[in-house]
Amino acid sequence: SSDLDVDRYTVEGIYQQVYLAARELNIEKLPPAAQESWVNSRLQYTHGYGVVMTPAVQGGDEPITWFVRDIPIQSDFGVKVGRPGIYYGEGKYQYVIAPNEIGEIDHPQGNTNVMTDYTGGGGVPLDSILRKILFAVYFGDRNIFFTTKTTSESRIIFRQNFVEAIQIITPFFLLENDPYIVTTSDGLFWIQDAYTLSNYYPYSQPYDTDISERMFGDLNFNYIRNSVKIVVDAYNGDIRYYISNPADPIVQAYRRIYPGLLKDMEEMPQELRKHVRYPKQYFTVQMSMFSRYHQVNPILFYQEEDDWEFIEMNYGPLLPYYLTLNLLNPQKQEFILVSPMSPTGRDNLRSLVIAGCDEENYGKIFVYSFPKGEQIFGPAQIIALINQDTAIAQELTLWDQAGSRVIFGKMIVLPIGNSILYVQPIYLESAYRLKIPELRRIIVSQGDLVVMDRTLED
């Protein structure tokens, strides 16, 4: 099991946004008898397997396109997944011993299981009686000492949750709450953004907003930099730290304290650098502060005449989200982070702020603001227009009455030329079958025009 990650890949020569998820091992989903078996849970079910990937743009009423699918892994689109074993991930893990005499279950195939033997360098070798005794005491499990199924190559693999491992190794870095997996020809890798913090930056306002507690708990700071990108090998568990902001004095101090720990960004393999992105939490902090400090006129600033806020939706604030558009360069699709903003206490759209994620524009912030007197409909007003459209409302009501639940997906705000396009996906969830929401319609709005169809192209 794993959460859904958003990224961009070049698939069949087309640069496009995708959704992908790692197939991590979830021992709790095994039958109870298998969970209770020490051999099953410690020697055989040792790792997850591969990823699934779909394009972000899919049409309603059409079969799902899979860039990467199935077990064993298949890709009809040439997407490479090297070494698919996932021994290190985001989930809850317990120690395992690999390789071993029984063999590890890699993946099912037909009515049998394909077996494998771990060849990585993760964990600690169990190559002596002393080590077996020490680990048996450490984990409170005598089976580690008494088992006869280990070999001279066996390793005990623990702390597979790489987030916890990073926090143990470098507790002075704050970690982004949404690491993501990347598939390459060399294997699967996790990318984790990390921050340096301080509460002692002179003449700087502390970060304290309605959203801050949800993202950072009770942390107090008035300085934050996304100075480190961390790469974790999902097979070996190798953790590599790369400095993404060399101008940060705090990260340079850590570099001097721990020589060899922090590498230059240029040392990151190019196949991974293509997937580095501007982090959401960092951009959310910036937008929370910029929503007031964009006002350069002192009178307007103190009167708070043009304060902004995140747009409020029925599910909460509309926080920054990733898109792939040719907005920054008409000749080229780019992966960007978008944050629509509204005037404080009002529903209309006031600005679109965009952060570049690709190398050429990485970290550059672009602000598209609309004149204060111009009323540009915001997402909440678009929802009201949708509800007022009799044809759309009638069709949605029919679906509801037919035993399906209509679900409004997350609205997307797209700048197109000199206008704003709103895209509202509509999902149906069956009340009788497996409750997986299915994309059925796309509602598009521009100005006061609202249209519903099966796909965005229609």
What does each model-found stretch correspond to?
Residues 2-458:
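Soluble extracytoplasmic regions of secretory-pathway and membrane proteins
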